[in-house]
Amino acid sequence: MLKSIQRNGKKQKNGSKDKEPTPPKEQPLVNGNHDMNGHASDSVAPTEQQNGETKKKSDSEVMEIIQDAGFTVQIMSPGVEPLSIQVSSMELVQEIHQLLMDREDTCHRTCFSLQLDGVTLDNFAELKNVEGLKEGSVIKVVEEPYTMREARIHVRHVRDLLKSMDPADAYNGVDCSSLTFLHTITAGDILEKKKGRSDSVDCTPPEYIMPGAKERPLLPLQPGVGKKGPQPLKVLTTSAWNPPPGPRKLHGDLMYLYVVTMEDKRFHISACPRGFYINQSTDDTFEPRPDNPSYLCHSLIDLLSQISPTFRRCFAQMQKKRTQRHPFERVATPYQVYTWSAPTLDHTIDAIRAEDTFSSKLGYEEHIPGQTRDWNEELQTTRELPRETLPERLLRERAIFKVHSDFVTAATRGAMAVIDGNVMAINPGEDAKMQMFIWNNIFFSLGFDVRDHYKELGGDAAAFVAPRNDLHGVRVYSAVDVEGLYTLGTVVIDYRGYRVTAQSIIPGILEREQEQSVVYGSIDFGKTVLSHEKYLELLNNAGKHLKIYPHSVLNDDEEEIELCSSVECKGIIGNDGRHYILDLLRTFPPDVNFLKLDEELSKDCKAFGFPIEHKHKLSCLRQELLEAFIESRYLLFIKHAAFQLQQLNTNKRQQKQDTPKEETKAIEPAAKEDSANNNKEEPAAKKGEPKAATGGVPKVETEEAKKLMESLLSSDEKNESREVVKRACEAVGSLKDYEFDIRFNPDVYSPGIQHVDNPNAANSIKKQKQLVKDAAEFLVKHQIPSFVHDCLDHTAAPMDGSTLTETLHSRGINVRYLGKVANLLAKIKQLEYLHTIAVSELIIRAAKHIFVTYMQNTEMMSMAAAISHFLNCFLTTATSVSSESDVLTKSGSSGKQQRKQNKRTAAGGGKGGKSSFQCTQDNNEWQLLTSKSLWAQIQQELKSYWDYDLLPAGTVDSADPVVTHNHLQKISLLRAFCLKTGVQILLREYNFETKNKPTFNENDIVNVFPVVKHINPRASDAYNFYTTGQTKIQQGYFKDGYDLISEALNLLNNVYGAMHPENAQCLRMLARLSYIMGDPQEALAIQQRAVLMSERVNGIDHPYTIAEYAPLALYCFANSQISTALKLLYRARYLATIVCGDNHPDIALLDSNISLILHAVGEYELSLRFLEHALALNIKYYGEKSLKVAVSYHLVARTQSCMGDFRSALNNEKETYAIYKQQLGEAHEKTQESSECLRHLTQQAVVLQKKMNDIYSNGKLTTGLPPIHIQPPSMGSVLDMLNAINGIIFVQISSKEIANLKNEIEKRQKEGGAAGESSVAQANQEEVDRLLTETMAKTAAGIPFEEQDNYELPLPAATTGDEASSSSKANPVASSS
């Protein structure tokens, strides 16, 4: 795919310039969303394959793969010029085939073969295996005769070409199409634009993005919508005369088509082995013989061009436009991305679309031998592929990802068909909620409590949550990837109020009862329990990574059964001999804060208001939390043992009083403080976070403790050492006496399970329970407060509910704690914006819970009216349904009413075939909802689920008081609600304040999409390269970092194809590195791809996409594209205000960027409005004395001085000076610069005042006064400032410092004598590091440097202080793959 992108004339920008990456061999043809939690990480623990040895090999393997020799071949096609293309020996012949079908001059051919010296090439052969193929070989394109299948593929391809410019597929959420507007905003490809001069820039921002604007229009969300492209044909469809009758088949007829041209002529066309021709049939008469002339052509496009001049002209225009589009605008995404708003679309006649809808197959299915796919076999076979070497792992991961994304697409389509009543149940006689379905070799079940299976755990509420928990289990077991242990392909789909679980089918499971199939686990929640030797071995291996503790339980016959998972986890050996596990809903231990137990919780948990009794008993702790908890306990264990050992040594050496005292100093306080089971100061221990790495203890102490532990292990006094370890194990709750072992028993609080217990052992059930309680307490006592504390520096400021949820999940905090988090945030003024986002997310989730039931009680005919009524009740003051709905409901004749009644009766309370998901209750029930009743339900749900009080009872009768009190905005609530529930609304302006008519009517509800949750297979080698690259960057080796991340991107392209969120992240990092290393043009090219990709795979208004716009604007400005830079920043600010309003730290950064560029082009008044808003936000979120605020004051002063308002400028610069003086000291360079600036402004103000006095007194100017200098800023100084506020700082080292550096190095060389080159290099590096540290402070506030002959050394922002961290999104070190 990537190869074909490059051949389309786009220069490859990611890797090294002298080599091209190996393209993926297969394309994902398919669709969906982010992974189940929105975050793209499925890492559990490094698999056994990624050990040190493999890693050593991997560098050379990667180079071998990526530097694979390319060569040039010539392609000769009939009727077009010969074409030279660069190919790789690892490519398949199929890829040349695909390339030709994509090129402008050959795209209309599909049925052809490629021949070398008269020999037809095998499509699935690698080029290196083709005999005689070498540099300069000529490959001929030979037209082949059509078969029925080939003719259908050709027609489908022609139809795809004709609608390639039509965005309908993206709006309808089909064929992995999605929207992108970057090129609409920038009016074409940025790279092809000429540099703009500042005097010719149109830079007026639209009124709605100005600071303080209350209006939030929706139409600019999708600019340029409604522009119609060229239309080549009115109708192209299959004819109603199909299929050809027997006699005509014997004459070679394959199929018939019907065409209406733009000239309004109608033609019937026959397909035969030689191509397509006009026949003599009409709409009423079947006459299949060739017409005169018949225009026989091998390609349908050639035929249509002959019969319609308009088609010939329009098709050429369309092709030109299609090939001008960036390849990233056309490539399919791996999962379908849905948009929450859409314009009114024309619905055209399209027989192929109709055929796809009503066939039971999946679009591409007829191209695959054997028709429907055996999903289970495909999913499991790909996991069994070898994985020893890098090429093997790449092939395996690519195959896993490809099959998985296809499976997600098929499962989503099947789930919609099930709920739409388009699939027959396998148990049609049962109640609708109990029905199960099989479609396309996928098993579908509904989220209801069938046969009281979850009665003890919360009934339907538990049944609704169980699939999501099961998916968590599948995710972690898949990521651990133990050889020989298999999980089912699993996708959870929420659609129209129903939760559907789609699973691949274990071979043979449908042939026997479940009781006969299960060889491990329990099917009745612990009454009968089975164990199996092989399963114990496999699950024990996986359990080591997942921290699951092996335990024994008693079955009904009082027999002892050993388990290495929860009791519910079932093991089934399929007919294929594979060991499958399913029902993984209790993979992780229960969350005791949400269970009513006989036991007491700790004081801290009680103080937080726990336990809260949930509707279900399936609340589990997250894996991220368990990892953080175990790491924290391990550090505690080390410190305890070290402290005990010190005391032991002290007692031995009483005669030496001084030494032990000093030794003990480092650890004693920490160990004593920690010896209570948990320590308040101990923050999150999450891998990859610097604080976590030391558990909150100063580094010296932890290092000291580790050294002491080493001496402990080598100690001769074994018994004393054992005692020390034993006491440390007891202190941290280890499940072994003489070894640190913290794992969790997921069944420890399961009702009805009898555990085998030894009360006096280290692993007694009491201790196992205590560990689970401690982990829940750790979440409340450490993770939540440390999350709130870390938010105070605003480095990763979530912008909406999805990014907030993602951040919480990364720390192991479940969303059910969001009420408690919101209460904490409410107390901190600097986190007001985050409190608003948290409350908004709580309201949306509560509304979604109510909406699910509401949708289930609504019949299909009233769906649009019911959804619009719900939105009216939710966001406005609504009492009754809109008049149109009333008409719909009341106007039916009595016969119509009777028919509906009969239909409901026939359904028998929901029993039976296809009407099963039509509502079986009175269809008027939804009309009874009012704003008051809905908000009462929302408040009740918030209290029962999150223990959160929105406002005092009785004060909420509509959205208005809630919106006002919590600083929410209705457009953001509408967006979030639509994304959560899958509702798509009409793109128009909505007036939420209208009183006399409803805001929403049924015509505003365009569609309802599925919301899909699934696992995200990971490209492990690419991830390793990426993280190594990040480490290099943090050490200051940018070129090495760049090369490693380029290789990571090549590997990602290999595994995921060209489109994936992780690819976008890689591109952003490469663009930033290119910019830091002094190549802004390269940075611009790469960042443009990052923005396009983010729009396609994350969504046009996703916070990640918004974050990609600001760097692109910076790189545009650096390339003198000023107008484009402003348009991009306006777009980013508009999207941010739709998502979260303009009260957010990221808005301050955007406003500072906008104001600087407006300042550069002389729009001082506009610039000042944005600057003052940025200043107000910075004061609010960073405090009045922060360096960010100092910079904002300075920028305001600079702009005011350019406007001639010296008095105001003087006042603002005084604020800057005061902050610098307080924070950096009077002697600091920045303070001196500010002082100089004050002197200059004072001088200018005095001159101005004298001139004014002169005019007032004499009516004319006296000569001799110096002129007033209002110097417009240079583009260079503006760019310096832009770099600084975006966290990119080029450290300046003066000539004097360089001289010092040289002297120091020479001195060391003399001292070291012949120490060799390596020591000199090391000395050099150390001295550079020292100088950098000293000089970083000079640039921390980012004011432009005075012109001087300086040496520049670029440094990424992550290594500097306040200013550098101003944007985590732009911070090259902050992101991770």
From Swiss-Prot:
List cystine links.
none
The annotated regions of Low complexity compositional bias extend over: 1364-1377
Per the record, which residues fall in region Disordered? Answer: 1-61, 651-700, 886-917, 1310-1377
Single GO cellular component annotation? cytoplasm
Database matches in Gene3D superfamilies: Hypothetical protein (hspc210) (3.30.2280.10), Tetratricopeptide repeat domain (1.25.40.10)
Q: Which residue windows does the record flag with biased composition (Polar residues)?
A: 886-896
Please report a single Pfam family linked to this protein.
Answer: eIF3_p135
Q: Keywords assigned by UniProt?
A: Cytoplasm, Repeat, TPR repeat
Name one process (GO BP) from the record: intracellular distribution of mitochondria
Where in the cell?
Cytoplasm
Give the TPR repeat ranges.
519-552, 1022-1055, 1148-1181, 1183-1216
Q: Which GO terms describe its molecular function?
A: mRNA binding
Q: Where does it mainly reside?
A: cytoplasm
Which CDD domains does the record associate with it?
A: CLU-central
InterPro entries cross-referenced by the UniProt entry:
CLU-central (IPR033646), CLU_dom (IPR025697), CLU_N (IPR028275), CLU_prot (IPR027523), GSKIP_dom (IPR007967), GSKIP_dom_sf (IPR023231), TPR-like_helical_dom_sf (IPR011990)
Domain Clu, by residue range, is: 353-595
Q: Where is the composition biased (Basic and acidic residues)?
A: 655-690
Q: What does this protein do?
A: mRNA-binding protein involved in proper cytoplasmic distribution of mitochondria.
Q: Which family does it belong to?
A: Belongs to the CLU family.
From the Swiss-Prot or TrEMBL record, give the protein name.
Clustered mitochondria protein homolog
Species of the source: Culex quinquefasciatus
